[in-house]
Amino acid sequence: QTLKETLFHEKLENGLEVYLLPKVGFEKTYGLFSTNFGSIDTTFVPLGQKEMIKVEDGIAHFLEHKMFDMKDGDAADKFAKLGASSNAFTSSSRTAYLFSTTTNENACVELLLNFVQSLDITDESVEKEKGIICQEIKMYDDDPDWRVYFGAIANLYHKHPVRIDIAGTCDTVNNTYKDMLELCYHTFYHPHNMMLFVVGNIQPEELVDVIKKNQNKKHFLPETSIQRKKIEEPESVAVKEQIDIMQVEMNKLIVSIKVNDIMTNPQEKIKRELSFNLLFDLYFSKSSVLYNEWLSKGYINETFSANFTQERDYAFILIGGDQDDYHLLQKTIFDFIEHIDDLVIEQEDFERIKRKTIGNFINSYNSPESIANSFSRYYFEGICSFELVDYVSKITIADLNEVKKYFNKEYASTYIVKKDK
């Protein structure tokens, strides 16, 4: 209601959740088809089986690469012929396929459904893909920004698969085979584990008919709830400090903090995430006193950032940036962690940051990409992204002070990418 949007929702007989958001006056239409399956889903009970199995790391990303293969060509080429662009991405907890178009909207939705709901792979095509993915992994390995970011996360975890790169390693990629990909596909690409979201220049009643007709032609096994292995992760961090030597112009450092309190209540979870976001905005936005003080003293530069991430069953804080004197940056961050309770939050500053955040959320609803990506990101967490404005408006200073307890040196680790002298 706050956003004055009308969202159409229908759950189809096969279990697929469909959400359609018509935007009057929008030229662009954006479709996103997501599955609740990401890089951390490597130990599970396959559909129709009883025993838990472990598949290779990086398999969700490998499958994403192969989904565009169709019996009669490549899905991306078919979207291009319809005047649309297409893409896909894999995160730790989901895989999403998407298109963007200003024409042939219904045909694009059908193509999206068709290519994601059929897997056309051969042993040869799987083998061929291995080299391509390995090249991608090596490219990321050579990127110092990726190395410090991912290394900071990996340092925190002993057992949780989030410590492993989304694409896996060249070894795990080379040990991935056709039957394993098919097993994951049939388990996680079942309609009941997926969600279709289309936003833009659409006629919802007409489009929902197109979607229903498309789905009625297809046969799926009866749905069963997916059993994933619960990870028993120790509270301690795996590695306290790590230094990598690379060819960089300036040293890079990230302090990561493991958050062991894994929330299951969606409302509590989103409240915590938004409280962290407001807190970091308060301390580290370009207009904040603390940020500008650190900047003027040379503790940090424009690369500095701080953020909080939480997914299905893990959460962490990352604070860092580029700094020649990385010892100084590390000390600055650890002093901040130690004395965060002494930093008083003024009501006036808090209200200003809240208004800014609400304004940003409302502005994001002018972009079909932002709407779809935000909806998909929160959907599998049990949150409707259209309610984010209401959640932010209810947050208090007490909520921000509450998340300060997670800034704990005991659960902190440092990852440094140091220049080769």
Predicted regions and their residues:
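His/Glu-rich zincin catalytic helix
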Residues: 1-74, 185, 189-293, 412-421
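Charge-rich, well-structured scaffold segments of protease-associated domains
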Residues: 70, 74-226, 266-271, 280, ...
